[in-house]
Amino acid sequence: MTAFTDSITHAHSPSPLTKGTPLALDAITKHYGHRTVLNDVQLRIPSGQFVAIVGRSGCGKSTLLRLLAGLEAASSGELLTGTAPLSSAKDDTRLMFQEARLLPWKKVIDNVGLGLRGNWREKAQDALTSVGLADRANDWPAALSGGQKQRVALARALIHHPRLLLLDEPLGALDALTRIEMQSLIENIWLQHGFTVLLVTHDVSEAIALADRVILIEEGRVGLDITVDLPRPRRRGSAKLAELEARVLERVLAPTSSPLPQQAAI
């Protein structure tokens, strides 16, 4: 059977079971007509890193994720994995949205295995087990809560063994408790499989709790690039997390002053 069912609660770094996709963004610029949404973005993201991208609405963070997913093309610049175009890794990339986007006329297990051929049902069942929904395989999506629907969407991504997982506000519509449960689930699965993660979120506390690195996008540029050098599992409400969260929030809420990135670690 496919090894989806292991549980890791106290790991400190991702295992190499699935090698993550390394990313290089060289001078990425994106225009919509006369409006520049991303402006000369330069980033290096190593294999297996968990990166959170934060910023005000309209700053370009979701646009950046869409470029990485291949849903849109950059106006200029290069997206690379190693020395190859990132488009060469599209089969290893999966994207989760704020809405689960399940097909209501298909049962849960069929949504997980959507588009697959051959003997996929066992793999789909394993993926559902890994997200805690082993007993909901034959239910209809309408019978699920919002959090359960997002778990199905996560299982649908996991069945493809992604090396790059892109998360565009996937927890934004969930209640506080369900959101914390989903955060823990995503973190544990990442620790187990070792893929590269880019999470776009408006929730700075979520970014600090989950990520190895938090990047703030300001007016289409990297305004802040912070390493979260704290052991896992992270204790919510700790002084160090609160200190780092306050620093990022202060920058998010302040008027933009300089487009140059600042780097720090805590």
Swiss-Prot record:
Annotated ATP binding lies at: 55-62
Q: Among its keywords, does the record have ATP-binding? A: yes
Reaction(s) the record says it catalyses: ATP + H2O + aliphatic sulfonate-[sulfonate-binding protein]Side 1 = ADP + phosphate + aliphatic sulfonateSide 2 + [sulfonate-binding protein]Side 1
Q: Which GO terms describe its molecular function?
A: ATP binding; ATP hydrolysis activity
Topology in the lipid bilayer? Peripheral membrane protein
**InterPro entries tied to this protein:** AAA+_ATPase (IPR003593), ABC_transporter-like_ATP-bd (IPR003439), ABC_transporter-like_CS (IPR017871), ABC_transporter_ATP-bind (IPR050166), P-loop_NTPase (IPR027417)
For this UniProt record, the keywords arranged alphabetically read as follows:
ATP-binding, Cell inner membrane, Cell membrane, Membrane, Nucleotide-binding, Translocase, Transport
Q: Name one Pfam family in it.
A: ABC_tran
Compartment annotation: Cell inner membrane
Q: Name one GO cellular component term.
A: plasma membrane
Enzyme superclass (EC): translocase
EC code(s) of this entry: 7.6.2.14
Residue ranges occupied by any ABC transporter domain in the UniProt entry: 23-244
Q: Which PANTHER family match?
A: ALIPHATIC SULFONATES IMPORT ATP-BINDING PROTEIN SSUB, TAURINE IMPORT ATP-BINDING PROTEIN-RELATED
Q: What protein family does this chain belong to?
A: Belongs to the ABC transporter superfamily. Aliphatic sulfonates importer (TC 3.A.1.17.2) family.
What does the UniProt function comment say about this protein? Part of the ABC transporter complex SsuABC involved in aliphatic sulfonates import. Responsible for energy coupling to the transport system.
Q: How does it assemble?
A: The complex is composed of two ATP-binding proteins (SsuB), two transmembrane proteins (SsuC) and a solute-binding protein (SsuA).
The name on file for this protein is Aliphatic sulfonates import ATP-binding protein SsuB
Q: Which organism is it from?
A: Pectobacterium atrosepticum (strain SCRI 1043 / ATCC BAA-672) (Erwinia carotovora subsp. atroseptica)
